[in-house]
Amino acid sequence: MEHIRTPKVENVRLVDRVSPKKAALGTLYLTATHVIFVENSPDPRKETWILHSQISTIEKQATTATGCPLLIRCKNFQIIQLIIPQERDCHDVYISLIRLARPVKYEELYCFSFNPMLDKEEREQGWVLIDLSEEYTRMGLPNHYWQLSDVNRDYRVCDSYPTELYVPKSATAHIIVGSSKFRSRRRFPVLSYYYKDNHASICRSSQPLSGFSARCLEDEQMLQAIRKANPGSDFVYVVDTRPKLNAMANRAAGKGYENEDNYSNIKFQFIGIENIHVMRNSLQKMLEVCELKSPSMSDFLWGLENSGWLRHIKAIMDAGIFIAKAVSEEGASVLVHCSDGWDRTAQVCSVASLLLDPHYRTLKGFMVLIEKDWISFGHKFNHRYGNLDGDPKEISPVIDQFIECVWQLMEQFPCAFEFNERFLIHIQHHIYSCQFGNFLCNSQKERRELKIQERTYSLWAHLWKNRADYLNPLFRADHSQTQGTLHLPTTPCNFMYKFWSGMYNRFEKGMQPRQSVTDYLMAVKEETQQLEEELEALEERLEKIQKVQLNCTKVKSKQSEPSKHSGFSTSDNSIANTPQDYSGNMKSFPSRSPSQGDEDSALILTQDNLKSSDPDLSANSDQESGVEDLSCRSPSGGEHAPSEDSGKDRDSDEAVFLTA
């Protein structure tokens, strides 16, 4: 609170960006964690909450006649424009937010003060919800080809890798350590995903320190060990996700890529994904297009094309598709790296795994995928997403691009994913919110030193608890799209990359429908389920009606002939003794035989009993069941009028006899 100069400012206007003339008047509050705007209108009383950690930039604009404008851009693509009456108050709010949005130490982040009112045991259970050891067991590891290595225990070899790593069985500790010394940041080749159907694998590392001519025997042996771990293939793909020009430039700095003359049985492949600086600028250009007020279609499309954003998304997708095909169709193992192996490598490995394994297309499986390929393998969350005050050139939307790749796949395969768009948007939101501890720091080592699991809560438990909100109504576990590998069209024209308005314009009320597609589909699904339940109830009622009719038929069968011992005249006291054919009225029902209990006791129903004993059966038999009213004429005489089908087969049908 010591950084807040003015905690409360009244008569502040919140400008509607779609309709600038519509400005809500209210009060602005600054707290230790949020900026809060509360409208004065009591009905309804609206509040706008913004986390300090979500603030990307703050722009103090020139003072106007109405006040001093303050423009706040957020990392979740929300834009807030405030007009503060006094310039002094505006300056105090501006200075306060500059400091609050850029904390200098982790303890200032929201997750260390966030308290969802859970006890210690519940917090611990939230952190063990996602267990990577169970995930590797699900893959079929360890086995004859891969083993769990403790070579990185206490982070002795690589401080940005996790302590538990899977390596080929033929790779000794000497080979591993030697390979790490020849790789940037000592990130040696390790297993990311094992495709147990054909023993192919996806491995990841950083670039080799090869320069123009340097080589390392242990690193060459490491790649041979990866090849031997796949008996179905005699070569390994080495995929460098960088543009070839960039990789060649790194050679001049003593880094670079593998020389095929030194590494036997490898096939080298460049992909061409640009670096973090190009991606940051591309996103900025696209957001500038999104901020245009009432742009023409041509201006919007030109700006989107000029940003290059969708081209970068396609490059990441192309890399993932190439790796997935190499593994599933060619049966070849793949080693993926970029420069340091924690940005483009994470993108490509996770996209390929998502295409290969339907488990990662489920709610829990997707959490596991992010935990495995992003969190445990040392993606630099702090540097890339500006959790703390640092170098702005390190910020880049790396995981945002991966999340968009998933959304593009969901648009192409709408029945293949258990989760919906809202699930992806909420994950993106909490990567920047710092409300949970999952996405803090740059490595597993840093998180353990800060005791993140003991001091914060897990996002995965929160999402899992509310999983009903994130279900895809089109998902079917038995659908062809949910089985095995996703095969994308080979021709580019069959795969359309779209602008994700649900992400980048989701706060623009005038651009989004009042009801999202997901909510609409969920409503349709719930209504369909309700109708199915009503149909089931009606079918049960039909069974009851049919049972009554069968019992009446039984009675008629037993009393069809006149009683020889009764003292009553059958012509005077019988309601009807003319056989009738009800097959025309019952042709919609399946033939049923009466139960054993019905055979033992005859059921005699009076006309009044038939009408009053079950109001539902009496009142609704015509309207809902399609069964003709079986009530008879008075005992004074007369017979039932024969049905339309009575002359078809009188000998095969039995008459219904109802005793008055």
Swiss-Prot record:
<protein>
    <recommendedName>
        <fullName>Phosphatidylinositol-3-phosphate phosphatase MTMR7</fullName>
        <ecNumber>3.1.3.64</ecNumber>
    </recommendedName>
</protein>
<comment type="subunit">
    <text>Heterodimer (via C-terminus) with MTMR9 (via coiled coil domain); the interaction enhances MTMR7 catalytic activity. Does not homodimerize. Interacts with RAB1B (in GDP-bound form).</text>
</comment>
<dbReference type="GO" id="GO:0006470">
    <property type="term" value="P:protein dephosphorylation"/>
</dbReference>
<dbReference type="GO" id="GO:0012505">
    <property type="term" value="C:endomembrane system"/>
</dbReference>
<feature type="domain" description="Myotubularin phosphatase">
    <location>
        <begin position="126"/>
        <end position="504"/>
    </location>
</feature>
<dbReference type="GO" id="GO:0046856">
    <property type="term" value="P:phosphatidylinositol dephosphorylation"/>
</dbReference>
<feature type="binding site">
    <location>
        <position position="340"/>
    </location>
    <ligand>
        <name>a 1,2-diacyl-sn-glycero-3-phospho-(1D-myo-inositol-3-phosphate)</name>
    </ligand>
</feature>
<dbReference type="GO" id="GO:0106018">
    <property type="term" value="F:phosphatidylinositol-3,5-bisphosphate phosphatase activity"/>
</dbReference>
<dbReference type="GO" id="GO:0016312">
    <property type="term" value="F:inositol bisphosphate phosphatase activity"/>
</dbReference>
<dbReference type="GO" id="GO:0005829">
    <property type="term" value="C:cytosol"/>
</dbReference>
<feature type="binding site">
    <location>
        <position position="342"/>
    </location>
    <ligand>
        <name>a 1,2-diacyl-sn-glycero-3-phospho-(1D-myo-inositol-3-phosphate)</name>
    </ligand>
</feature>
<feature type="binding site">
    <location>
        <position position="344"/>
    </location>
    <ligand>
        <name>a 1,2-diacyl-sn-glycero-3-phospho-(1D-myo-inositol-3-phosphate)</name>
    </ligand>
</feature>
<dbReference type="InterPro" id="IPR030564">
    <property type="entry name" value="Myotubularin"/>
</dbReference>
<comment type="similarity">
    <text>Belongs to the protein-tyrosine phosphatase family. Non-receptor class myotubularin subfamily.</text>
</comment>
<feature type="modified residue" description="Phosphothreonine">
    <location>
        <position position="578"/>
    </location>
</feature>
<dbReference type="GO" id="GO:0004438">
    <property type="term" value="F:phosphatidylinositol-3-phosphate phosphatase activity"/>
</dbReference>
<dbReference type="GO" id="GO:0016020">
    <property type="term" value="C:membrane"/>
</dbReference>
<keyword id="KW-0963">Cytoplasm</keyword>
<dbReference type="InterPro" id="IPR016130">
    <property type="entry name" value="Tyr_Pase_AS"/>
</dbReference>
<dbReference type="GO" id="GO:0052629">
    <property type="term" value="F:phosphatidylinositol-3,5-bisphosphate 3-phosphatase activity"/>
</dbReference>
<feature type="region of interest" description="Disordered">
    <location>
        <begin position="554"/>
        <end position="660"/>
    </location>
</feature>
<feature type="binding site">
    <location>
        <position position="250"/>
    </location>
    <ligand>
        <name>a 1,2-diacyl-sn-glycero-3-phospho-(1D-myo-inositol-3-phosphate)</name>
    </ligand>
</feature>
<keyword id="KW-0597">Phosphoprotein</keyword>
<dbReference type="InterPro" id="IPR036003">
    <property type="entry name" value="MTMR7_PH-GRAM"/>
</dbReference>
<feature type="binding site">
    <location>
        <position position="384"/>
    </location>
    <ligand>
        <name>a 1,2-diacyl-sn-glycero-3-phospho-(1D-myo-inositol-3-phosphate)</name>
    </ligand>
</feature>
<keyword id="KW-0175">Coiled coil</keyword>
<keyword id="KW-0472">Membrane</keyword>
<feature type="binding site">
    <location>
        <position position="275"/>
    </location>
    <ligand>
        <name>a 1,2-diacyl-sn-glycero-3-phospho-(1D-myo-inositol-3-phosphate)</name>
    </ligand>
</feature>
<dbReference type="Pfam" id="PF06602">
    <property type="entry name" value="Myotub-related"/>
</dbReference>
<dbReference type="InterPro" id="IPR011993">
    <property type="entry name" value="PH-like_dom_sf"/>
</dbReference>
<feature type="binding site">
    <location>
        <position position="339"/>
    </location>
    <ligand>
        <name>a 1,2-diacyl-sn-glycero-3-phospho-(1D-myo-inositol-3-phosphate)</name>
    </ligand>
</feature>
<feature type="binding site">
    <location>
        <position position="343"/>
    </location>
    <ligand>
        <name>a 1,2-diacyl-sn-glycero-3-phospho-(1D-myo-inositol-3-phosphate)</name>
    </ligand>
</feature>
<feature type="coiled-coil region">
    <location>
        <begin position="521"/>
        <end position="551"/>
    </location>
</feature>
<feature type="binding site">
    <location>
        <position position="341"/>
    </location>
    <ligand>
        <name>a 1,2-diacyl-sn-glycero-3-phospho-(1D-myo-inositol-3-phosphate)</name>
    </ligand>
</feature>
<dbReference type="GO" id="GO:0004725">
    <property type="term" value="F:protein tyrosine phosphatase activity"/>
</dbReference>
<dbReference type="GO" id="GO:0005737">
    <property type="term" value="C:cytoplasm"/>
</dbReference>
<feature type="active site" description="Phosphocysteine intermediate">
    <location>
        <position position="338"/>
    </location>
</feature>
<dbReference type="InterPro" id="IPR030572">
    <property type="entry name" value="MTMR7_PTP"/>
</dbReference>
<feature type="compositionally biased region" description="Basic and acidic residues">
    <location>
        <begin position="641"/>
        <end position="653"/>
    </location>
</feature>
<dbReference type="Pfam" id="PF21098">
    <property type="entry name" value="PH-GRAM_MTMR6-like"/>
</dbReference>
<feature type="binding site">
    <location>
        <position position="276"/>
    </location>
    <ligand>
        <name>a 1,2-diacyl-sn-glycero-3-phospho-(1D-myo-inositol-3-phosphate)</name>
    </ligand>
</feature>
<dbReference type="InterPro" id="IPR010569">
    <property type="entry name" value="Myotubularin-like_Pase_dom"/>
</dbReference>
